[in-house]
């Protein structure tokens, strides 16, 4: 697979939609080395054991009832691309339904941009909890991109089993959140559908995307808090190294991250973590977990920077007396 093959896949993009998803998959994979996925049975079982342990310890610490996907998918980069092309295809279906008027050059540009984004992320993503938004199933999925986990552990000078376990705990925290808040997937789907439908009509509904960003900031921030409570070992060095990894990279890499909006992901981690650290300091983990009781308890954009205002609102809504 070569960049030439990737370019050829984009050039041959066809169909009637805004994006040729088959060409996206082909081009993204042509531009990306799949990585080594030669695991022994014991190595594969170690991932599953970490997930089981994470579920047990997260339930004990948080009191949240949730399940993890029955199948833990240990992927190479191409597998991850395929899984996410399927998600993107579902999310952007309204664009394809209303884009038959697009000239071929626009379709090729959309295809190339999406393929480039997926190729780039596939080389960096470590794990992913996938709630399978907008899918015709109530199932969910858990992915570990093994070549990237191995590479990151090596570059950060961290023992692979310990790093693998850290990633497993982080992704299982997301399963805990979606399990604790059955409404969360529907809420995210509503915002996605509203935003994409507006784009299909030639509009930009900023409010939908803003609410989506705020919700994901809460998701990432609570996950960071829960990780700190549940992980079974020293983690300060892992946290510091991963924070540096999120902020680091060459100037070109950082430019690409900014262009793809990946800097927003780092902002979600940092802003969400600061919010929940303040909440937990005042009301403990149980107080922070109130965020999943009702969609109305999600913080607003302003409250993310004023967590005590959120605490006051949630306390008043529940008819409680503030401490």
Regions found by a protein language model. Name each.
Residues 186-223:
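Acidic/histidine-rich catalytic neighborhood
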Residues 1-82, 161, 287-323:
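N-terminal low-structure segments adjacent to metalloprotease catalytic domains
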Residues 48-148:
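Auxiliary, metal-adjacent structural segments of Zn-dependent hydrolase domains
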Residues 150-167:
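Short pre-active-site segment immediately N-terminal to the catalytic Zn-binding motif
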């Amino acid at each position: 697979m070569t960049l030439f093959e990737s370019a050829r896949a984009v050039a041959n993009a066809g169909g009637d939609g805004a994006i040729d998803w088959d060409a996206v998959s082909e081009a993204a994979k042509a531009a990306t080395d799949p990585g080594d996925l030669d695991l022994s049975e014991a190595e594969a079982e170690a991932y599953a054991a970490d997930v089981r342990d994470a579920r047990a310890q997260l339930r004990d610490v948080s009191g949240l009832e949730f399940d993890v996907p029955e199948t833990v998918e240990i992927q190479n980069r191409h597998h991850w691309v395929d899984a996410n092309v399927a998600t993107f295809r579902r999310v952007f279906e309204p664009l394809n339904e209303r884009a038959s008027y697009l000239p071929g050059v626009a379709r090729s540009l959309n295809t190339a941009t999406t393929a480039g984004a997926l190729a780039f992320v596939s080389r960096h993503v470590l794990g992913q909890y996938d709630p399978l938004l907008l899918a015709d199933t109530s199932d969910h999925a858990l992915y570990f991109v093994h070549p990237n986990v191995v590479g990151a552990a090596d570059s950060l000078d961290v023992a692979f089993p310990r790093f693998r376990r850290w990633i497993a705990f982080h992704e299982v925290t997301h399963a805990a959140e979606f399990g604790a808040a059955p409404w969360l997937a529907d809420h995210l789907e509503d915002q996605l559908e509203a935003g994409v439908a507006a784009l299909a009509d030639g509009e930009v509904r900023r409010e939908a995307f803003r609410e989506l960003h705020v919700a994901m900031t809460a998701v990432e921030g609570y996950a960071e808090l829960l990780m700190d409570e549940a992980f079974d070992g020293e983690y300060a060095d892992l946290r510091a190294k991963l924070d540096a990894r999120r902020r680091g990279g060459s100037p070109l890499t950082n430019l690409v991250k900014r262009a793809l909006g990946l800097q927003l992901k780092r902002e979600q981690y940092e802003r969400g973590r600061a919010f929940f650290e303040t909440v937990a300091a005042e009301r403990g983990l149980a107080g922070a977990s109130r965020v999943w009781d009702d969609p109305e308890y999600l913080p607003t954009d302003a409250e993310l920077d004023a967590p005590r205002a959120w605490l006051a609102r949630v306390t008043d809504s529940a008819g409680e007396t503030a401490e």
